[in-house]
Amino acid sequence: MTNRSQDKHILVNRDALIDGTIVSVLVTGSAITLYKGYTCYLKQLTNASQIPTKVFRRKWLYGKVTSVGDGDNFHFFHMPGGVLGGWGWIRAVPKLTKNEKKTASLSFHWGTNKLKQQNATYKNKRNLPTISVRACGIDAPECAHFGNPAQPYSEDALIWLRHRILGKKLWIKPLKTDQYGRCVASIRIWTWLGYSDICLEMIKEGLAVVYEGKTGAEFDGREGKYRRHEFIARAKKKGLWSQKRLQTPGEYKKRYQ
């Protein structure tokens, strides 16, 4: 083989090596980019402990409510990216069973204190990879538990919240994780009039009071608004404010702790 042929052969091998290296770098770079994109935007969070610190107070999470435990907490199935993230066509979304049972609850359609037959559209679905969420800035009447009696309007608050959000998709903004491992969060659901604050709705209907704790309260900057509407609901004797001898959820907890 002549020197010229040898040089040409070396150049071809060198070019092939360079091309292979470039392709390898591009593939590796693309894989890293895809992985970072997935972990940042499309990775599902399955409990409150998995929520990154950078998300608290800054970002909204999208998902579906799969169960409602009482008047101020529920389980949230995180669906990052929504439809664009593959949910409903590549990634499975939990389907809830329709609830045919009619239950009496406080009417909220006409802003009265009259009881009406109202259907919680779906039944709770448990044992799913969900985030336990505690509504921020409010306290709903306590349901019966650990042998303690239920507070008046606790069942109304529970049924109202189930009717309002169970089986529906909404947004939460994580604010902190409480001592029970729940994500304390601000909550928004889409309506024809725009996004609605679920916590504020409950205060307006007299189905929750502004959170009474002296420390650790979270309002996402809306404490003043919550207190104004609590004052209005109280003046109108809406919901729990219609009682002659009112015991707030905070007072109830102190009594039975």
UniProtKB/Swiss-Prot annotation:
Entry-linked SMART domains: SNc
The record's GO molecular-function terms, alphabetically, read: endonuclease activity; metal ion binding
Q: Indicate where this protein resides in the cell.
A: Mitochondrion; Membrane
Q: How does it sit in the membrane?
A: Single-pass membrane protein
Q: Specify the taxonomic lineage.
A: Eukaryota, Fungi, Dikarya, Ascomycota, Saccharomycotina
Q: Which Enzyme Commission number(s) are on file for it?
A: 3.1.-.-
| Annotated organism of origin | Candida glabrata (strain ATCC 2001 / BCRC 20586 / JCM 3761 / NBRC 0622 / NRRL Y-65 / CBS 138)
Q: Which UniProt keywords apply?
A: Calcium, Endonuclease, Hydrolase, Membrane, Metal-binding, Mitochondrion, Nuclease, Transmembrane, Transmembrane helix
The record's comment on protein family reads: Belongs to the LCL3 family.
Where is Ca(2+) bound in this sequence?
Answer: D139
The protein's matches in InterPro entries, at most eight in alphabetical order, are given as: SNase_OB-fold_sf (IPR035437), Staphylococal_nuclease_OB-fold (IPR016071)
Q: GO cellular-component terms in the record?
A: membrane; mitochondrion
The main location is mitochondrion
Name of this protein: Probable endonuclease LCL3
Active site, per annotation: R134, E142, R182
Q: Which residues form the TNase-like domain?
A: 59-243
Q: Give the residue spans that cross the bilayer.
A: 17-34
